[in-house]
Amino acid sequence: MTSPRRLLFVVNNPAFFLSHRLPLAEAARADGYEVHVATMDGPSVPDIVARGFAHHVIPMTRSGKQPLQELRSVWALVRLFRRLRPGLVHLVTIKPVLYGGIAARLAGVPAMVAAISGLGFVFVAGGLKARLLRAAVGRLYRLALGHRNSRIVFQNTADRDVLARLGAVRAEQVVMIRGSGVDLGQYRVVPEPAAPVTALMAARLLRDKGVREFVEAARLLRQRGLSVRM
Protein backbone atom coordinates (compact mmCIF):
# COMPACT_ATOMS: atom_id res chain seq x y z
CA MET A 1 0.00 0.00 0.00
CA THR A 2 1.25 3.48 -0.86
CA SER A 3 2.19 5.52 2.21
CA PRO A 4 1.45 9.25 1.82
CA ARG A 5 4.06 9.97 4.51
CA ARG A 6 6.85 8.03 2.78
CA LEU A 7 9.21 10.40 0.97
CA LEU A 8 11.95 9.24 -1.39
CA PHE A 9 14.78 11.54 -2.49
CA VAL A 10 16.48 10.52 -5.75
CA VAL A 11 19.89 12.16 -6.31
CA ASN A 12 22.70 10.96 -8.56
CA ASN A 13 25.62 11.53 -6.16
CA PRO A 14 25.41 10.66 -2.43
CA ALA A 15 27.80 13.50 -1.55
CA PHE A 16 25.50 15.94 -3.38
CA PHE A 17 22.57 14.78 -1.26
CA LEU A 18 24.54 15.54 1.91
CA SER A 19 25.68 18.95 0.68
CA HIS A 20 22.42 20.11 -0.93
CA ARG A 21 19.40 18.21 0.44
CA LEU A 22 20.29 17.00 3.93
CA PRO A 23 18.55 19.86 5.82
CA LEU A 24 15.38 19.34 3.76
CA ALA A 25 15.41 15.59 4.44
CA GLU A 26 15.95 16.17 8.16
CA ALA A 27 13.11 18.70 8.25
CA ALA A 28 10.79 16.24 6.50
CA ARG A 29 11.68 13.52 9.00
CA ALA A 30 11.06 15.91 11.90
CA ASP A 31 7.64 16.60 10.36
CA GLY A 32 6.76 12.91 10.50
CA TYR A 33 7.84 11.66 7.08
CA GLU A 34 9.53 8.30 6.60
CA VAL A 35 12.49 9.45 4.52
CA HIS A 36 14.34 7.24 2.03
CA VAL A 37 17.31 8.23 -0.14
CA ALA A 38 18.30 6.68 -3.49
CA THR A 39 21.69 7.49 -5.02
CA MET A 40 24.42 5.75 -6.94
CA ASP A 41 27.04 4.04 -4.77
CA GLY A 42 29.91 6.06 -3.32
CA PRO A 43 32.01 6.81 -0.24
CA SER A 44 29.34 9.12 1.22
CA VAL A 45 26.68 6.41 1.45
CA PRO A 46 27.72 5.33 4.99
CA ASP A 47 27.29 8.97 6.11
CA ILE A 48 23.70 8.94 4.84
CA VAL A 49 22.96 5.66 6.63
CA ALA A 50 24.65 6.91 9.82
CA ARG A 51 22.19 9.81 9.89
CA GLY A 52 19.32 7.35 10.10
CA PHE A 53 18.03 7.41 6.52
CA ALA A 54 17.11 4.27 4.60
CA HIS A 55 19.44 4.20 1.59
CA HIS A 56 18.97 2.48 -1.77
CA VAL A 57 21.72 2.13 -4.38
CA ILE A 58 20.65 2.75 -7.97
CA PRO A 59 22.75 1.94 -11.07
CA MET A 60 23.33 5.43 -12.41
CA THR A 61 26.31 7.39 -13.70
CA ARG A 62 26.65 11.16 -13.89
CA SER A 63 27.71 11.33 -17.53
CA GLY A 64 27.19 7.90 -19.08
CA LYS A 65 25.67 7.87 -22.57
CA GLN A 66 25.24 4.13 -23.20
CA PRO A 67 21.55 3.58 -24.10
CA LEU A 68 21.28 0.16 -22.44
CA GLN A 69 22.84 1.47 -19.23
CA GLU A 70 20.46 4.43 -19.19
CA LEU A 71 17.46 2.14 -19.70
CA ARG A 72 18.74 -0.01 -16.86
CA SER A 73 18.73 3.07 -14.62
CA VAL A 74 15.12 3.88 -15.53
CA TRP A 75 13.97 0.31 -14.92
CA ALA A 76 15.81 0.16 -11.58
CA LEU A 77 13.91 3.27 -10.47
CA VAL A 78 10.58 1.82 -11.63
CA ARG A 79 11.22 -1.32 -9.56
CA LEU A 80 12.32 0.71 -6.53
CA PHE A 81 9.23 2.93 -6.70
CA ARG A 82 6.93 -0.08 -7.02
CA ARG A 83 8.61 -1.82 -4.08
CA LEU A 84 8.72 1.19 -1.72
CA ARG A 85 5.42 2.74 -2.86
CA PRO A 86 6.31 6.27 -1.70
CA GLY A 87 3.63 8.92 -1.51
CA LEU A 88 6.08 11.51 -2.85
CA VAL A 89 9.36 11.43 -4.76
CA HIS A 90 11.73 14.40 -4.77
CA LEU A 91 14.02 14.29 -7.82
CA VAL A 92 17.25 16.28 -7.83
CA THR A 93 19.72 16.92 -10.72
CA ILE A 94 19.30 16.14 -14.41
CA LYS A 95 19.29 12.34 -14.68
CA PRO A 96 17.18 11.71 -11.57
CA VAL A 97 14.66 14.26 -12.89
CA LEU A 98 14.53 12.70 -16.37
CA TYR A 99 14.64 9.04 -15.39
CA GLY A 100 12.87 9.42 -12.07
CA GLY A 101 10.05 11.43 -13.64
CA ILE A 102 9.43 8.74 -16.25
CA ALA A 103 9.70 6.00 -13.60
CA ALA A 104 7.27 7.82 -11.29
CA ARG A 105 4.62 7.87 -14.03
CA LEU A 106 5.19 4.20 -14.92
CA ALA A 107 5.09 3.13 -11.27
CA GLY A 108 2.04 5.21 -10.40
CA VAL A 109 3.70 7.37 -7.73
CA PRO A 110 0.98 9.75 -6.46
CA ALA A 111 3.06 12.95 -6.30
CA MET A 112 6.39 14.26 -7.57
CA VAL A 113 8.69 17.23 -7.01
CA ALA A 114 11.49 17.87 -9.52
CA ALA A 115 14.23 20.33 -8.59
CA ILE A 116 15.95 21.89 -11.61
CA SER A 117 18.99 24.05 -10.95
CA GLY A 118 20.38 23.77 -14.49
CA LEU A 119 19.77 22.01 -17.80
CA GLY A 120 23.33 20.96 -18.63
CA PHE A 121 25.63 21.45 -21.61
CA VAL A 122 23.09 20.09 -24.10
CA PHE A 123 21.14 23.36 -23.95
CA VAL A 124 24.15 25.68 -24.31
CA ALA A 125 26.42 23.80 -26.72
CA GLY A 126 26.42 24.41 -30.47
CA GLY A 127 26.76 22.08 -33.43
CA LEU A 128 24.71 19.31 -35.02
CA LYS A 129 25.32 16.79 -32.24
CA ALA A 130 24.07 19.22 -29.60
CA ARG A 131 20.96 20.04 -31.65
CA LEU A 132 20.12 16.36 -32.03
CA LEU A 133 20.67 15.77 -28.32
CA ARG A 134 18.49 18.76 -27.46
CA ALA A 135 15.64 17.32 -29.50
CA ALA A 136 15.95 13.95 -27.76
CA VAL A 137 16.33 15.43 -24.27
CA GLY A 138 13.39 17.76 -24.90
CA ARG A 139 11.16 14.74 -25.53
CA LEU A 140 12.45 13.11 -22.34
CA TYR A 141 11.62 16.25 -20.33
CA ARG A 142 8.08 16.26 -21.72
CA LEU A 143 7.68 12.65 -20.58
CA ALA A 144 9.41 13.14 -17.23
CA LEU A 145 7.58 16.31 -16.20
CA GLY A 146 4.16 15.27 -17.46
CA HIS A 147 3.06 13.89 -14.07
CA ARG A 148 -0.42 15.23 -13.30
CA ASN A 149 0.34 15.88 -9.62
CA SER A 150 3.76 17.52 -9.68
CA ARG A 151 5.68 20.68 -8.93
CA ILE A 152 8.81 21.75 -10.81
CA VAL A 153 11.20 23.91 -8.79
CA PHE A 154 13.40 26.36 -10.73
CA GLN A 155 16.19 28.64 -9.57
CA ASN A 156 16.19 30.87 -12.64
CA THR A 157 13.68 32.01 -15.23
CA ALA A 158 15.91 31.02 -18.17
CA ASP A 159 15.59 27.28 -17.42
CA ARG A 160 11.86 27.67 -16.83
CA ASP A 161 11.40 29.45 -20.15
CA VAL A 162 13.40 26.83 -22.08
CA LEU A 163 11.25 23.98 -20.76
CA ALA A 164 8.07 26.00 -21.24
CA ARG A 165 8.95 26.55 -24.91
CA LEU A 166 9.49 22.80 -25.25
CA GLY A 167 6.03 22.18 -23.83
CA ALA A 168 7.54 20.27 -20.91
CA VAL A 169 6.08 22.33 -18.04
CA ARG A 170 2.71 23.88 -17.33
CA ALA A 171 2.37 27.22 -15.58
CA GLU A 172 0.60 25.67 -12.59
CA GLN A 173 3.54 23.31 -12.01
CA VAL A 174 6.19 26.02 -11.68
CA VAL A 175 7.67 27.05 -8.34
CA MET A 176 10.43 29.70 -8.41
CA ILE A 177 13.03 29.95 -5.64
CA ARG A 178 16.08 32.20 -5.31
CA GLY A 179 18.57 29.38 -4.79
CA SER A 180 19.30 26.42 -2.56
CA GLY A 181 20.00 28.68 0.40
CA VAL A 182 22.80 28.90 2.96
CA ASP A 183 22.74 27.52 6.50
CA LEU A 184 23.63 30.61 8.52
CA GLY A 185 24.27 28.38 11.52
CA GLN A 186 27.33 27.03 9.72
CA TYR A 187 28.22 30.00 7.51
CA ARG A 188 27.82 33.18 9.49
CA VAL A 189 27.70 36.66 8.02
CA VAL A 190 31.02 38.47 8.47
CA PRO A 191 31.96 42.09 7.75
CA GLU A 192 33.12 42.81 4.23
CA PRO A 193 36.92 42.99 4.00
CA ALA A 194 38.74 46.15 3.00
CA ALA A 195 39.41 46.89 -0.68
CA PRO A 196 40.22 45.60 -3.18
CA VAL A 197 37.01 43.73 -3.92
CA THR A 198 37.68 40.04 -4.61
CA ALA A 199 35.41 38.10 -6.99
CA LEU A 200 35.49 34.30 -6.85
CA MET A 201 34.14 31.96 -9.50
CA ALA A 202 32.80 28.98 -7.54
CA ALA A 203 32.39 26.44 -10.33
CA ARG A 204 34.12 23.74 -12.30
CA LEU A 205 36.42 25.18 -14.94
CA LEU A 206 34.20 24.29 -17.88
CA ARG A 207 33.18 26.48 -20.80
CA ASP A 208 29.45 26.02 -20.14
CA LYS A 209 29.95 27.06 -16.50
CA GLY A 210 30.92 30.57 -17.58
CA VAL A 211 34.72 30.52 -17.53
CA ARG A 212 34.98 32.64 -20.68
CA GLU A 213 32.54 35.21 -19.29
CA PHE A 214 34.47 35.38 -16.02
CA VAL A 215 37.75 35.98 -17.86
CA GLU A 216 36.09 38.61 -20.07
CA ALA A 217 34.70 40.38 -16.99
CA ALA A 218 38.20 40.47 -15.50
CA ARG A 219 39.56 41.94 -18.73
CA LEU A 220 36.90 44.66 -18.84
CA LEU A 221 37.42 45.61 -15.20
CA ARG A 222 41.16 45.91 -15.71
CA GLN A 223 40.59 47.94 -18.88
CA ARG A 224 38.42 50.37 -16.92
CA GLY A 225 40.99 50.69 -14.15
CA LEU A 226 38.75 49.29 -11.41
CA SER A 227 40.37 47.75 -8.36
CA VAL A 228 38.92 44.25 -8.40
CA ARG A 229 40.83 41.02 -7.81
CA MET A 230 39.48 38.03 -9.76
Task: For the regions a language model picked out, list residue spans one by one.
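Nucleotide-sugar donor-binding and catalytic loop/hinge architecture
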Residues: 1-4, 184-198, 222-223
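N-terminal strand-loop element at the rim of the active site
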Residues: 11-69, 176
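Nucleotide-sugar donor phosphate/pyrophosphate-binding loop at the beta->alpha transition
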Residues: 19-20, 68-75, 110-113, 121-144, ...
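Short His-centered aromatic/hydrophobic patch
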Residues: 91-97, 116
